[in-house]
């Protein structure tokens, strides 16, 4: 069975646009298919949109840009989101993803709790919980690709999937 596109967006990202995207998600995500999937995917979308906004590589005269697509098939929901980021940020991101993808769900939960209790806030205002929260909700590895845009930045795409627990 081929995937159905539930939501697609490409353009600038602001807090107002994040709110609009999340509202559209709530309207388009089927209520009856998998309520647990809807809750998990909503949490994943919030984290991904905030991260794409916060870690976007742009000049002061540019608005941050993203691409986003949410699809579903019989058993899965898949969010693909991309944005331009500094190569330094992407190196940290992909290193963390590679590390976290090797962990079990219980290890991810434990690391999440340790990170909360450590209380360290980064210079960008985060605590490093976003990826862990995404992985806790997804329960599947994050797939990523990067494409260089110039010497200092690249476009990074993340693909996050959720499998309907009733259809596993």
Model regions: which residues?
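Short alpha-helical basic/polar micro-motif
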Residues: 46-47, 132
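Conserved short strand/loop->alpha-helix "switch" segment adjacent to the catalytic nucleotide/phosphoryl-transfer site
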Residues: 23-46, 116-124
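Conserved phosphate/oxyanion-binding catalytic-loop motifs
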Residues: 11, 15, 48
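A short, charge-rich alpha-helical start-of-domain segment used by transcription regulators
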Residues: 15-22
